[in-house]
C-alpha cells in the first residue's frame, strides 16, 4: 500500500517509513523501496556472498584486515552465523558487468586465503545443501544417530530437495538402552566412559553406519542442559563422531548458551564435521560440486 510507505525528503536526505512485521516490510521494500532507490542511484550495486564454515569470526576478520582497512569499492562485510561466517563483497559500477568485474578479484583472493573452509559462493546455498551436494556428487549414502539433538541434524539434511537419493535413515537414540539395542554401543563402554564420551560417540557412528549400510554416519551425544552437567562433564560438552568409509573421527566440543542454542550449535558442528571428513578421507577420486 503506497499510503503505508512514504518517502519524505529534501535535497539532502530521504527517509522511508516502513512497517515492522517482516511479512509486510519485505514485499513493500522489494516492490516499492528498491525501485525508488534505484531511480536515485547512478549506476548499479552488486554483491556476492562467500560462505565459510568452521572458522571463528575473529579469525576471519584478522585474515581480512588488510582488505577491509581503507576499503572503498568494493566493500567487504562479515556476518556471523551458528558455526558459519558469511562474507559479502559489494561493488558499484556503471552496470552489472562493471560491478561484477570489480568483485571478481576479491572473491578470488578470498578463495586463496580460506580454501576448503569456503562451502559456497552462492547466496542461496545453505550448509546442508553443500553437504548434500558433496554426498550426491560422490554417490555416498548417509545416516544420522542423534542423542542430545533429537533429530535436528536429520531435519537439516531433509531440508534439501532430492536428498532421498543419499539419506538412508536417522535414529534418535536418547537412552543408553537405545544406544545399545540399535547402535551396538557396548555396555562396558557406557559403564566406564558414560553416554557423553568420545568412545560412545565413536561406537554410535560406527554402529549407525553398520546398521544402515551407509558410507557416511554422523553421531552426536552431549549435555544440552540446563541440568545434567558436572564439574567433569559440564553443560555444553558434546562429542560428535563421523564415520566415512570405515574411517572414524571423533571431536570434543564445548558450547555455551541455552539448551536450544547448544543443540543448534551441535547440529551445525555435525554438518561441518561431516563435510570435513568427506573432504579429507582417503579417496582415489573425490568429485567436488560447483560452489
Label each residue range with its predicted role.
Residues 1-12, 283-291:
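Single conserved hydrophobic/aromatic residue that forms the stacking wall/gate
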Residues 6, 10-38, 256-257, 267-273:
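Short alpha-helices
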Residues 9-10, 41-43, 67-71, 77-82, ...:
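Solvent-exposed alpha-helices and their adjacent loops that cap or buttress functional pockets
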Residues 17-83, 88-90, 99-103:
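Accessory alpha-helical/coil subdomains and C-terminal extensions
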Residues 16, 48, 249-253:
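Structural signal for short hydrophobic segments within the conserved structured cores
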Residues 82, 93-94, 244-247:
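Short acidic-glycine loop/turn motifs at beta-strand connectors
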Residues 22-23, 94, 223:
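Short, glycine-/Ser/Thr-/acidic-enriched flexible segments
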Residues 98-282, 286:
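Short alpha-helical segments enriched in small residues
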Amino acid at each position: 500500500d503506497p499510503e503505508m510507505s512514504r518517502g519524505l525528503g529534501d535535497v539532502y536526505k530521504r527517509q522511508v517509513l516502513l512497517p515492522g512485521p517482516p511479512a509486510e516490510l519485505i514485499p513493500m521494500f522489494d516492490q516499492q523501496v528498491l525501485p525508488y532507490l534505484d531511480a536515485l542511484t547512478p549506476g548499479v550495486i552488486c554483491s556476492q556472498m562467500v560462505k565459510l564454515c568452521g572458522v571463528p569470526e575473529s579469525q576471519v576478520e584478522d585474515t581480512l584486515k588488510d582488505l577491509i582497512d581503507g576499503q572503498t569499492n568494493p566493500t567487504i562485510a562479515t556476518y556471523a552465523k551458528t558455526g558459519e561466517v558469511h562474507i559479502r563483497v559489494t561493488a558499484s559500477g556503471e552496470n552489472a558487468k562493471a560491478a561484477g568485474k570489480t568483485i571478481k578479484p576479491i572473491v578470488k583472493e578470498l578463495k586463496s586465503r580460506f580454501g576448503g573452509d569456503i562451502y559456497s559462493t552462492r547466496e542461496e546455498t545453505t550448509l546442508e545443501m553443500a553437504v548434500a551436494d558433496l554426498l550426491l556428487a560422490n554417490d555416498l549414502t548417509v545416516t544420522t544417530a542423534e542423542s542430545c539433538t533429537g533429530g535436528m541434524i536429520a531435519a537439516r539434511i531433509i531440508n534439501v530437495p532430492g536428498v532421498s537419493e543419499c539419506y538412508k535413515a536417522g535414529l534418535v537414540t536418547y537412552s543408553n538402552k537405545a544406544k545399545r539395542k540399535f547402535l551396538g554401543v557396548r555396555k562396558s563402554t557406557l559403564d566406564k566412559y558414560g553416554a557423553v564420551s568420545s568412545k560412545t560417540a565413536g561406537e554410535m557412528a560406527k554402529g549407525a553406519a553398520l546398521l544402515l549400510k551407509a558410507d557416511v554416519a554422523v553421531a552426536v551425544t552431549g549435555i544440552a542442559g540446563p541440568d545434567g552437567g558436572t564439574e567433569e562433564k559440564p553443560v555444553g560438552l558434546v562429542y560428535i563422531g563421523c564415520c566415512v568409509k570405515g574411517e572414524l573421527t571423533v571431536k570434543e566440543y564445548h558450547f555455551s548458551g541455552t539448551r536450544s542454542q547448544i543443540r543448534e550449535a551441535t547440529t551445525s558442528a555435525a554438518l561441518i564435521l561431516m563435510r570435513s571428513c568427506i573432504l579429507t578421507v582417503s579417496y582415489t577420486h573425490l568429485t567436488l560440486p560447483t560452489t
